A protein has these predicted regions:
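Sec-dependent N-terminal signal peptides
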Residues: 4-13
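C-terminal segment of classical bacterial N-terminal signal peptides
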Residues: 14-18
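N-terminal acidic, glycine/proline-rich low-complexity segments
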Residues: 20-306, 394-395, 477
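Short, N-terminal intrinsically disordered low-complexity segments that are rich in Pro/Gly
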Residues: 58-65, 243, 322, 339-347
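Hydrophobic alpha-helical scaffolding
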Residues: 175, 179, 243, 343-344, ...
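Active-site nucleophilic cysteine motif
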Residues: 245-254, 342-352
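Non-transmembrane, aqueous-exposed alpha-helical and coiled segments at domain scale
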Residues: 260, 293-343, 349-478
């Protein structure tokens, strides 16, 4: 019996090491040449909870690598995904025409963004392969120069890449802008052994892919991804150029999610994928931008957003919290405070911190290790409950460690794919909250109903007023 129990326990431990309660369907590395269609495609990849963007490489094409890097980094920064690695392919000799629409259309704040210290794409890709063991889709939104470079220089690439998805704007495999950027790489890639899925652009037949109705619907979605694409259509240079309304490289994002909406013809290791369902594809854009590509919850389908569902004192703030901070923070906040059994400010801070960390890396739940320095003594330790719910990093999953240092701190470290950041509540915010709680405790005492009523009232106010992008210091540890 003892031997059986020992084997059983070892089996459980091993299962814990290798199991995962939920994983996205697609792990991707994206290569881009900086086109505005690439911006729409990348935004869609980032918006989908069923896709994990592990890294982005930039190569010459529509823009030079340096300018493409600036566009990509400014886009990621504007979406608060600063932790996604971006590398540069400087090997390709193609001289970019620097198309004005792509060059002049902003993706985010470019001030302070420079390609000077950007990592080499091969080094970056190699580091991704060393940490992520799930097979990857390598997506080429421009040329296949970077893909070919990786194939030549990373010996075990075939063990890590299950397919290449390449956007082709030509009528065949051997023509079009993306093919001609690096003809040698294109020709060699089409002859190698790993599957290549060649995704065609949507052929308009006198119909714009992004018609007025689709653009209108995108503008009503009210999240940071839809707002970024709406800003493109609102910009003077893009909205007055017909290319903005075509469905080109963003077909890669749609194909990854909805391959049945394409006519797929396979010959050898090459599959030609042609968009075929216009209505379905337009609806697919909306679904992706809304994040409706996978169920986010385990038991309930969705939490109501109707204020009347909630307690009377929080009803006036429901819509504002969701509009300002998104449905993820709202849902995590509701669940964390139900778990916590009272509405507390440090539980709310923990939720905001966890969502901010997930944003930084663009991860889902259960995907990184967290170490909390909030200790085990309330009220600061209440932050741990918010962290657990918002990140899925729980003690039961072995993903949350609580440090009991002599002096606790409203901070936590998050480690994902050999990268670590530390988030700390800004001192002035921490002092304001702590002083307020101490004063309420001094006046009313912890056993007073008035104390807990005022804590609840203040917690709702902090939930509504504290922006997670403004209240934390974010430090890169490594």
């Amino acid at each position: 019996m003892k031997r059986f129990l020992s084997i059983f326990l070892v089996s459980l431990i091993t299962l814990n090491l290798y199991s995962h309660p939920w994983k996205p369907s697609h792990y991707v590395i994206v290569d881009t040449d900086g086109g505005i269609d690439d911006m729409k495609a990348i935004t869609m990849f980032l918006a989908s909870p069923d896709v994990r963007v592990l890294a982005i490489s930039v190569s010459p094409g529509v823009l030079s690598p340096d300018n493409a890097y600036i566009k990509v980094k400014s886009l990621l920064n504007s979406l608060y995904h600063e932790g996604i690695p971006v590398g540069i392919n400087h090997i390709s000799s193609y001289k970019s025409p620097e198309y004005p629409v792509a060059l002049k259309t902003p993706r985010g704040e470019e001030k302070g963004v420079s390609a000077e210290d950007a990592p080499d794409c091969l080094k970056m890709i190699g580091e991704i392969f060393s940490t992520e063991k799930t097979k990857i889709s390598f997506i080429c939104l421009g040329s296949m120069s970077t893909a070919f470079l990786a194939l030549q220089n990373i010996p075990d690439l075939k063990q890590h890449v299950k397919e290449f998805i390449w956007c082709s704007d030509g009528s065949g495999y051997t023509d079009g802008f993306n093919y001609n950027i690096d003809k040698n790489a294109s020709a060699r890639m089409l002859k190698q052994e790993i599957l290549i899925k060649v995704v065609r652009k949507y052929e308009p037949d006198n119909t714009e892919f992004y018609n007025a109705e689709l653009i209108r619907i995108i503008s009503t979605l009210n999240n940071k991804y839809s707002k970024r694409i709406s800003a493109l259509f609102d910009s003077d240079i893009a909205k007055n150029h017909p290319f903005s309304y075509e469905g080109t490289d963003e077909m890669a994002a749609l194909f990854l999610h909805f391959p049945d909406m394409f006519i797929n013809k396979t010959s050898g290791n090459i599959t030609e994928c042609t968009p075929s369902d216009l209505s379905g594809l337009r609806n697919g854009v909306v679904r992706i931008l809304k994040g409706e590509t996978v169920s986010r919850n385990q038991v309930i389908r969705d939490l109501p957003v109707d204020p009347s569902f909630y307690s009377e004192d929080i009803r006036p703030s429901v819509k504002e919290i969701i509009d300002r901070y998104g449905i993820d923070e709202w849902t995590s906040g509701v669940l964390a405070n139900e778990l916590h059994r009272h509405l507390g400010v440090f539980a709310v801070i923990g939720v905001k911190m966890g969502i901010r960390a997930r944003e930084y890396f663009n991860t889902g739940v259960d995907e990184f290790h967290a170490v909390s320095f909030a200790g085990s003594i309330p009220p600061l330790s209440c932050m741990n409950d918010g962290l657990q719910v918002s990140t899925g990093a729980t003690p039961g999953h072995g993903l949350l460690t609580v440090k009991n240092d002599p002096v606790p701190s409203p901070s936590a470290e998050f480690t994902y794919m050999n990268r670590k950041i530390r988030l700390t509540l800004r001192p002035e915010i921490a002092e304001m909250i702590s002083s307020e709680l101490e004063e309420l405790n001094f006046i009313y005492g912890l056993d007073s109903n008035i104390y807990w009523e005022l804590v609840r009232k203040n917690s709702i106010r902090y939930w509504r007023d504290l922006d997670r992008h403004e209240i934390f210091d974010v430090r890169v540890v490594f």
